[in-house]
Amino acid sequence: MQAVNIIRWIDGPVLVGDSPGSKPPSERLQDTMAVSDPPVEAAGEASATRSGFWALTLGSIGVVFGDIGTSPLYAFREAVSHAAQQGTVTPVIVLGVLSLILWSLFIVVTAKYVLLLLRADNNGEGGTLSLMALGQRALGRQSLLLLALGVVGASMFIGDSMITPAISVLSAVEGLKLAAPEFGNYVVPLTLLILVMLFAVQSRGTASVASAFAPVMALWFVAIAVLGALHIHEDPSVLLAVNPWYAIHFLLNHGLIGLVIMGLVFLSVTGGEALYADLGHFGRKPIQAAWFCLVLPALLLNYFGQGALILAHPDAIENPFYRLAPAPMILPLVILATAATVIASQAVITGAYSLIRQAVQLGLLPRFEVRYTSETHAGQIYLPRVNILLLIGVLLLVLLFRTSSGLASAYGIAVSTTMVADGIMGFVVVWKLWNWRAATAAALVVPLVVVDIMFFSANLLKLLDGAWVPLLFGLIMVVLIWTWRRGAAILIKKTRRTEVPLLDLIKSLEKRPPHIVKGTAVFLTSDPNFVPTALLHNLKHNKVLHEHNVILTIETAQTPRVDPSERVRMENISEKFSTVSLRFGFMESPNVPKALVIARKLGWQFDIMATSFFVSRRSLKASAQSGMPVWQDRLFIAMSRSANDAINYFQIPTGRVVEVGTQVII
């Protein structure tokens, strides 16, 4: 096995290189679709039947496209209304904004994500952290630049996961003001109620309603397509916006305002990053089919329909999306829009859970408590602390901005940051992993990254108008990850000074053996070359040694999943000592007892009822010479104390565990 530099956890796993011979497990259908997991090849298309392929395609419509699919509620309105602030709505403004939206969807979403990055799968999986791990593997070493890009991109996704539910649900509920103006004062309270209910049901899982996600979202896309198509005839000149010159002309003639409008046009592509993040759930071809066959045409028809409506009726700028519908249909459309935004929010929340779990597995964050909400789908998880923090953030955003127009100013900066990070890491993959010439890779990827940077710059102009909020959330995540990694590295360095090499201890015990007791003792450690703290304390205080002693290390590979045949590595180092290494992918939940069943098949006579697991629990105290500022020392210690203990995280039976407490000064 070719290893890369390692990242160690406190009493936890190690990040290791993947085995060249490892094989990806079968692809699984998105967990939120309440159907069984079909076996599919890598990204899930080759072995799927035609019906299975279209089931995956329909499933992706219900999960992948919720965010970008609800953008017509506010994106076009915000861009045109800001462009027309100095006067009336003109054809130049409408055609310019429409052209910008159309070509943004073509370049950012279609070219970059649908056609390029969906091919950059990490054993079938996608997402910012998966792309980071893929880039590290392509380079064959740890890269601080890639690590920084992955951390920043993932952190900004968390910031975005707070604002997406807020703006989506709020923009949907605002339709009530058209259906029944007297309900205008109840928009914010109703939005808060819906969001609280959404987060409250997370602990129960979504399996019972997940099967309805795809049909509802499919109905949503059909509805917005029909509504848009019915109005294009009011001013067919909007079709001229297909010509990119209208976008270029608009930017050239509007100066700084044009750049501000670009930041609002970007709202039409937010959610594009979800296409890559959900690659592992559905596969490349089903996502591409859903995009080209339904989602993209529906979005374009709706945006062009809004444009034609505004040219024919300039007063419709107040809420052009809902004005597309006849008066009797506004209330049903509000209900459908609310359902669509709740589904979009659910997908973002689930994505945040998954991303946090990946970060924990990669050693970027402390262990969070993970609860499983489904007996049949391992991907349906619930993180209580993360759920509470997300809910607080979402409610604060609604109370702070109170309208979707206000939130629109805050939206985009986090997503654009993630997209820039994805683009740069994508270049590394195209260049190093796909073995393209640097010039060819640059010719393909650099123009896409330049567009991302333009959108990022445009969103920076909204910093004082509210964009600082998601940026602040993202920066807090960056600080937490930086503190955890830095503190863990310092802790490992300090504890290494006092650790005893395992082979030296074994030789010493052979010369002067202690009292031997029956049974097997398993000692968890992050480095099998040194004596676990729990073993030293057992010898020091209990003065006994078990018949069989297993030094157990849990490692996290740079691949999403590890094939069961690659799960366990065993080595006998003496008559009484052996080492066992368990490898898990960064998208898997470590289950030690299940993994040890594989060890039994390899010849280890393992009886869990005659086995004791020894785990050390460290109590940290700060020192003036830690190498970190005092505030960071305290933050690291607080994060360490809040971490879920190894017993629960690795699903070890509590009745077979012996905990040994130690105090460490960092």
UniProtKB/Swiss-Prot annotation:
Membrane-spanning segments: 53-73, 89-109, 144-164, 181-201, 212-232, 247-267, 291-311, 324-344, 381-401, 411-431, 441-461, 463-483
Keyword list, A-Z: Cell inner membrane, Cell membrane, Ion transport, Membrane, Potassium, Potassium transport, Symport, Transmembrane, Transmembrane helix, Transport
GO molecular function, one term: symporter activity
UniProt keyword Transmembrane, yes or no: yes
A cellular component annotation (GO) from this entry: plasma membrane
Pfam families per record: K_trans (PF02705), K_trans_C (PF22776)
PANTHER family: LOW AFFINITY POTASSIUM TRANSPORT SYSTEM PROTEIN KUP, OSMOTIC STRESS POTASSIUM TRANSPORTER
Name of the protein this chain belongs to: Probable potassium transport system protein Kup
Classification of source organism: Bacteria, Pseudomonadati, Pseudomonadota, Alphaproteobacteria, Hyphomicrobiales
